[in-house]
């Protein structure tokens, strides 16, 4: 037939299938010349930009495929052959985000991931196209101040190699200029109310000002990281904010990387922790790393043990044990597992012991504290019962009964199917249990269920 006739036939066959037809046109254009591809992509981007109809779930996949096809065409067919044009088109592609998100639900995150991929592509293309550092910085600035949907969240990091020192400094100065330009507050009668909170009206100018402040702070922090300027990073946080555990950890890690160990430890020690005793893991991990860097291994070990003791953190326990001398680790592990059995949250204790794994202790904990079992937490009790069933059928049965009892006592009709399955599993385990100790046998338990919940026919119909 020849390639020309074959192409014509394929286009005729694809009539009525718009995505396939667009894909064919792109491929045919690529066989012709990169300029033809660029023209096709430019036209398609313009069409998507002009579209105003809401994209429902029926059309969502088509949109995703369309966006991905345009992005891939820029990357695969243009980036290496026409890098300057590819760079311009990728900027245009990223500008689609606002119009797309304004008419599309992206609760799954699939669409935003396409734009995040495009940002990464932009960085690579910019290195090949080699635009002027100042122009690229200006484009980055204009994008960051219009980052309403988070499409440009990773832009600075992606562009660092192409921006170079001059571009980063230019972008920094533009952000500093923006920091001195607060959003104008209109007269009271001109202010636009866009929502309500417990504190009263939410005004458009307030949101715009918060966005400006956040944009400047995040951009200057990323630039500071790229320039290796720890003090500039720290300067973006006011003194009280630096005392928050998460922020203190971020600052301390940068001071640690700069070998400013005393300042790193001081930053962490000045933190104001929340009440309750639960570890702030980011803060704890940063402190452990700083202590290790200062050769304070005993203090670091004490922190690891404390994290385990307070939260049954398996990660911290493993890190603790592997640093102990031979034979000491066995004794410490036994002490840790005994602590887990006595831990305040029974479900957390069971989850830890099952995953460690220490199934004998998990079974012992279940049987000793069976009255505390909360059957609402099926996400923990179901895998625990599955793990315990082969060797510890009584503990598995008690875990299953807890979920059955909760479903029936609370009349959770939606869970009746699972509860019925759990009851059948209990019946299967019954033959392996030689001693129920102080607990009801399977037959007595089923009899009690029929007495207390006999009228719940929806459940019993599923059992049989």
Predicted regions and their residues:
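Eukaryote-biased, non-catalytic alpha-solenoid scaffold regions
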Residues: 1-464
């Amino acid at each position: 037939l020849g390639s020309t006739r074959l192409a014509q036939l394929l286009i005729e066959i694809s009539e009525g299938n718009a995505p396939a037809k667009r894909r064919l046109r792109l491929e045919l254009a690529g066989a012709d010349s990169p300029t033809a591809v660029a023209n096709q992509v430019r036209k398609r981007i313009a069409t998507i930009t002009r579209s105003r109809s809401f994209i429902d779930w029926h059309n969502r996949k088509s949109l995703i495929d369309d966006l991905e096809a345009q992005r891939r065409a820029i990357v695969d067919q243009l980036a290496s052959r026409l890098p300057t044009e590819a760079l311009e088109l990728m900027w245009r592609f990223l500008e689609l985000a606002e119009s797309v998100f304004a008419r599309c639900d992206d609760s799954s995150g699939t669409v935003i991931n396409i734009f995040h991929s495009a940002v990464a592509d932009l960085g690579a293309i910019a290195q090949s196209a080699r635009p002027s550092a100042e122009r690229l910085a200006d484009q980055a600035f204009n994008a960051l101040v219009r980052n309403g949907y988070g499409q440009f969240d990773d832009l600075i990091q992606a562009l660092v190699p192409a921006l170079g020192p001059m571009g980063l400094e230019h972008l920094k100065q533009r952000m500093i200029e923006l920091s001195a330009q607060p959003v104008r507050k209109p007269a009271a009668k001109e202010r636009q109310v866009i929502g309500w909170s417990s504190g009263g009206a939410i005004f458009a100018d307030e949101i715009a000002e918060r966005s400006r402040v956040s944009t400047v702070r995040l951009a200057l922090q990323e630039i500071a990281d790229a320039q290796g300027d720890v003090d500039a990073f720290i300067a973006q946080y006011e003194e009280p904010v630096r005392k928050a555990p998460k922020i203190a950890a971020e600052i301390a890690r940068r001071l640690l990387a700069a070998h400013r160990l005393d300042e790193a430890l001081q930053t962490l020690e000045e933190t104001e922790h929340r009440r309750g005793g639960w570890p702030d893991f980011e803060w704890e991990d940063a402190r452990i790393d700083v202590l290790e860097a200062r050769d304070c291994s005993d203090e670091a070990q004490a922190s690891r043990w404390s994290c385990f003791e307070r939260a049954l953190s398996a990660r911290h326990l493993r890190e603790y044990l592997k640093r102990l001398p031979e034979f000491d680790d066995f004794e410490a592990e036994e002490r840790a597992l005994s602590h887990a059995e006595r831990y305040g949250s029974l479900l957390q204790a069971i989850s830890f012991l099952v995953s460690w794994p220490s199934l004998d202790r998990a079974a012992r904990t279940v049987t000793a504290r069976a009255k505390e079992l909360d059957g609402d937490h099926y996400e923990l009790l179901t895998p625990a019962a599955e793990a315990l069933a082969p060797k510890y059928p009584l503990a598995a049965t008690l875990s299953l009964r807890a979920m059955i009892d909760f479903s029936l006592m609370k009349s959770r009709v939606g869970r009746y199917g699972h509860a019925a399955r759990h009851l059948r599993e209990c019946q299967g385990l019954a033959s392996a249990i030689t001693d129920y100790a102080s607990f009801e046998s399977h037959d007595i338990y089923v009899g009690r269920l029929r007495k207390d919940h006999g009228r719940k026919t929806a459940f019993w119909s599923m059992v049989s």
